[in-house]
């Protein structure tokens, strides 16, 4: 059967999903999308995502692909899917992709955003599903910036992974290109993390560590020691899922001309810290130059 590869861009509120990946007996984003496709195509169809977000994690721009029969080339896939999907997951766009395009393996870097509620008192009920409100909410932002600088670069992030997940071929070394923060609203601060790949719960573990620094429970020097020890048991607790959102996935066509590693920090962002600040365009390139390694098939963000 002749097929056309379709590239999807999706957004979802992860609150009521048990993550992206299909699991028997529970609701996942993948299972919802595949069920909708089965109704349109008339047979099971696999959907491959750029990253397997965990239970409760949101996405503003999750990229995925599937192969559609060419006999259905007339179908407007975004409208057709949105007509079948629940309101907490939307297909933002759907377009034909190159036959060899792979949403996961072709990804060069990703940005995750984590939102903290900084005000005392109750969280705005319209925002409670998308922010973490640590108590007390007052945080030392300068100390958090200093600690974040320690984490930038190519490191073994074993201290910041979920120990219950088997390791893939890539091990625990990743390149964290940048961490920066921006106000997300009158009462919010958003931390963004860009890397060539993330270990399972890595961003939430990094955020939990930075908040511990902001509370004065851990120092920036302690963060360096935690990183060097490669021991998850000495690191602060994991930040909850509700504050985390997959914000962007970069592909080769998104890279600056001649650059095949990590994409640049967005121009409109004011980084708190970024890798090798004085290195110009090199600040977001892979160590040693060249292409980013393909993601491990077992990797889970």
Model regions: which residues?
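Structured-RNA-binding interfaces characteristic of tRNA pseudouridine synthases
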Residues: 1-286, 296-301
């Amino acid at each position: 059967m002749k097929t056309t590869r379709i590239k999807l861009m999706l957004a979802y509120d992860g609150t009521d999903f048990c993550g992206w990946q299909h699991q028997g007996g529970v609701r996942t984003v993948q299972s919802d999308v595949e069920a909708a496709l089965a109704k349109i195509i008339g047979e099971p169809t696999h959907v491959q995502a750029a990253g397997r977000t965990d239970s409760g994690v949101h996405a503003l721009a999750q990229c995925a692909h599937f192969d559609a029969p060419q006999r259905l080339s007339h179908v407007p896939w975004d409208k057709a899917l949105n007509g079948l999907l629940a309101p907490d997951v939307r297909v933002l766009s759907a377009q034909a992709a190159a036959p060899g395009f792979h949403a996961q393996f072709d990804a060069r870097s990703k940005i995750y955003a984590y939102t903290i509620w900084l005000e005392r008192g109750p969280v705005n009920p319209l925002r409670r599903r998308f922010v973490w409100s640590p108590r007390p909410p007052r945080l030392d932002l300068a100390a958090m910036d200093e600690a974040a600088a320690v984490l930038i670069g190519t490191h073994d992030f074993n201290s910041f992974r979920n120990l219950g997940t088997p390791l893939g071929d890539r091990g625990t070394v990743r390149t964290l290109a940048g961490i920066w923060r921006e106000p997300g609203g009158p009462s919010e601060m958003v931390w963004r993390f860009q890397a060539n790949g993330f270990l399972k719960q890595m961003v939430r573990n990094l955020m939990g560590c930075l908040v511990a620094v902001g509370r004065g429970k851990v120092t920036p020097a302690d963060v360096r020691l935690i990183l060097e020890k490669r021991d998850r048991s000495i690191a602060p607790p994991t930040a909850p899922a509700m504050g985390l959102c997959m914000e962007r996935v970069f592909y080769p066509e998104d890279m600056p001309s001649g650059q095949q590693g990590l994409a640049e920090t967005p121009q409109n962002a004011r980084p708190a810290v970024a890798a090798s600040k004085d290195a110009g365009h090199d600040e977001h390139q892979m160590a040693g130059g060249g292409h980013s390694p393909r993601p491990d098939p077992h990797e889970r963000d």
